[in-house]
Amino acid sequence: MEQVVIVDAIRTPMGRSKGGAFRNERAEDLSAHLMRSLLARNPSLTAATLDDIYWGCVQQTLEQGFNIARNAALLAEIPHSVPAVTVNRLCGSSMQALHDAARMIMTGDAQVCLVGGVEHMGHVPMSHGVDFHPGLSRNVAKAAGMMGLTAEMLSRLHGISREMQDQFAARSHARAWAATQSGAFKTEIIPTGGHDADGVLKQFNYDEVIRPETTVEALSTLRPAFDPVSGTVTAGTSSALSDGAAAMLVMSESRARELGLKPRARIRSMAVVGCDPSIMGYGPVPASKLALKKAGLSASDIDVFEMNEAFAAQILPCIKDLGLMEQIDEKINLNGGAIALGHPLGCSGARISTTLINLMERKDAQFGLATMCIGLGQGIATVFERV
């Protein structure tokens, strides 16, 4: 079976969904920009030799509809002979895109794939056109479709206090801002055209979603966003609404050698699981455990974790049950996470994997694990190993 390696991994800056940098940019353009950038950064690879493009996107309607992967590839002037498919596993879409490409390469059905994902939550809101089947309530609690309430449930089951959530959210912003100031994100962000507050076209090379002024004290004044009577989850401890895309160049290790391209990491294992929709945010725990089992590793073997921060109330129970509470500051989301950067649904799996690989290189780490919860009760995880 072929070894699958990541040769390159990049992303756009994360733009605010409400009147942000990409308010006049379309999701297809953000995607095409990264496709072109990956090819330009790796000139020994010709676009015509790509076997397939796998692109994650959740709200596949309006500008994100009609197979956005193909639309973006055509905009990027990738040869018409290269196919492209849009993947949807809700929040885990672009990580699923990575898994799909990896399996094609492992089985020898492909050698080189472009992988990534996008979501423009400013143009296509998360709830746009959603119409749950009325009979679903016979099998699943109605609140299971309301992500904030599932986070409330997790916090109550695991004893996660409001103060713990506020502290974690403040940490996310502080670490993301520190990474921005130190230049840690420069290796992953591709400058991307957008418009500033005055409508002037400019290149953005930083995440505009981060709020460096965030403090625990300020967060403590916010009202509960989902359960106004007895809730603890606020807008400040939830992932920000943002627009963005991320992309990875994935290939067999043998093809990378032929092209003279240096692999940055290999995929050691992959896993996806289901869980109770009412505690959908718990998915990273069984997914991570399964991925670790497949890799022949334990949580203590992992040097760096990237865990998508859907909500502080959601990620803290996962950290707790993976036995990592005492190692948060050494191993978990060292450059902040989605609370600070946002969670553009179809983008986030590739985004956290990209950030993880860059962190592994900076820390000279051997193993890293990226994992996410998924709406309606799933979890997905990938173990990476430095080459």
From Swiss-Prot:
Pathway stated in the Swiss-Prot or TrEMBL entry: Lipid metabolism; fatty acid beta-oxidation
* A GO molecular-function descriptor: acetyl-CoA C-acyltransferase activity
Gene Ontology biological process terms from the UniProt entry: fatty acid beta-oxidation; phenylacetate catabolic process
**Residues annotated as catalytic:** C91 (acyl-thioester intermediate), H343 (proton acceptor), C373 (proton acceptor)
| Reactions it catalyzes | an acyl-CoA + acetyl-CoA = a 3-oxoacyl-CoA + CoA
Q: What InterPro entries has UniProt attached to this entry?
A: FadA, Thiolase, Thiolase-like, Thiolase-like_sf_Thiolase, Thiolase_acyl_enz_int_AS, Thiolase_AS, Thiolase_C, Thiolase_CS
Enzyme Commission number(s) of this protein = 2.3.1.16
The text of the family note is: Belongs to the thiolase-like superfamily. Thiolase family.
Cite the NCBIfam families for this sequence: AcCoA-C-Actrans, fadA, PRK08947.1
* Protein name, as recorded: 3-ketoacyl-CoA thiolase
- What is the scientific name of the source organism? Salmonella choleraesuis (strain SC-B67)
Q: Which gene encodes it?
A: fadA
